[in-house]
Curated annotation (Swiss-Prot):
Active site: C61, D68
Compartment(s): Cytoplasm
Gene of this entry: queF
Function statement: Catalyzes the NADPH-dependent reduction of 7-cyano-7-deazaguanine (preQ0) to 7-aminomethyl-7-deazaguanine (preQ1).
Official protein name in the record: NADPH-dependent 7-cyano-7-deazaguanine reductase
Reactions catalysed according to its record: 7-aminomethyl-7-carbaguanine + 2 NADP(+) = 7-cyano-7-deazaguanine + 2 NADPH + 3 H(+)
EC number assigned by the record: 1.7.1.13
Matching InterPro entries: GTP-CH-I_C/QueF, NADPH_dep_7-cyano-7-deazaG_red, QueF, QueF_type1
Compositionally biased intervals (Basic residues): 1-10
GO biological process, one term: tRNA modification
A GO term for molecular function: preQ1 synthase activity
PANTHER family given in the database record: NADPH-DEPENDENT 7-CYANO-7-DEAZAGUANINE REDUCTASE
Length: 163
């Protein structure tokens, strides 16, 4: 039995100079300093949903400076552009030293992404862990859901404590 021919390893696509992907980058010091990159959507004529989940998002309380933690779920129906995931990771990490209330963080992230990629539709769910015994869940979306778009539940259970 003969062996199949050896295939040469796939050559990586050269990194685009416009993107952070494929390049060493400096961690942004604030959300305003962070850059969100977009790439062309090869399936722009098809309605579909893309989901990013950040289960360990952190920011700071603007009053006490104490850390706040959230599970973020970002759903969007892409238009001409896709959100590049490395830039999203860096953008979300920039909140680690940023003081803002839960509502401001969640809605601000949704608005910033929507402004950058101009999706057909976007929603963000911010499921914040309790501070002072009260969990805060924040939801925002750009508008009406495109007809026929399948959007699964965000899959984050309501906070139940230890019970």
């Amino acid at each position: 039995m003969s062996k199949p021919p050896r295939r040469s390893p796939r050559k990586p696509t050269p990194a685009s100079p416009e993107l952070q992907l494929g390049h060493e980058v400096v961690w942004p010091t604030s959300p305003d300093a962070a850059r969100l990159d977009r790439v062309a959507n090869p399936q722009r004529d098809t309605d579909y949903l893309a989901r990013f989940t950040a289960p360990e998002f952190t920011s700071l309380c603007p009053v006490t400076g104490q850390p706040d933690f959230a599970h973020l779920v970002i759903d969007y129906a892409p238009g001409a552009w896709l959100l590049e995931s490395k830039s999203l990771k860096l953008y979300l990490a920039s909140f680690r030293s940023h003081g803002a209330f839960h509502e401001d963080c969640t809605v601000g992230i949704g608005k910033r992404i929507a402004a950058e990629i101009k999706p057909k539709w976007l929603r963000i769910g911010g499921y914040w862990y309790p501070r002072g015994g009260i969990p805060i869940d924040v939801f925002w979306q750009t508008g009406k859901l495109p007809k026929g778009l399948w959007v699964p539940d965000q899959g984050v259970r309501p906070y139940r404590g230890r019970g």
